[in-house]
Amino acid sequence: MKTAITSLLVTGLLLGAAPAPATAQASGPDPDGPSLVVLVRHAERAGPSADDPGLTDTGAQRSRDLARLLGDAGITRIHSSDTRRTRETAFPLAGQEGLEIEIYDHRNLEAFAAALLAMPGRHLVVGHSNTTDEMSVLLGGASHGPIVEEWEYDRVYFLTPRPDGGMETVMLRFGPVPERP
């Protein structure tokens, strides 16, 4: 039931992100910008002791859940920081949709946000606990507060352009409920 409700919410959000008719006012969303940006933190990582850890089994399942959730979203580009855990989170959707994973510098979010706002299409951006919420704000969306580094892997942000040039932001949770320490 919860999955069905989430699917209905996402479908409604995506339908609301359809391109505006040609008669839209010039002050509306940039037609050369994104029609949808989806932001997620990487899935559960396999331990902080490794230099570049991959995903746990739970994280791998969450990445597959993400691909299932976004399978009908029409994602046209996938962006990931250059870490194994973010690439592994993006991989199921990239494989399913036949898309390349484009690497961005998560240490220079302002430049990436500016570039993203000039890219048409529907984007998935896979980041980190300290970048995902900040990226929402840099894109003109809302903050939903800091992500708890130790356990919070289930947030997904959907950003769609508003007529005033900002971004409408909806934050949902997906996949298995994370285990809190």
Task: Show which residues each predicted segment covers.
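Short hydrophobic/aromatic segments of transmembrane alpha-helices and their interfaces
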Residues: T6-S7, P29
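Active-site-proximal alpha-helix that buttresses catalytic centers in soluble enzyme cores
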Residues: A26-L116, P120, T131-E149, D154-P181
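Positively charged n-region of N-terminal signal peptides that target proteins for export
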Residues: M1-A4
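Bacterial N-terminal signal peptides
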Residues: S7-A17
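Signal peptide processing junction and immediate N-terminal pro/mature segment
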Residues: A18-S27
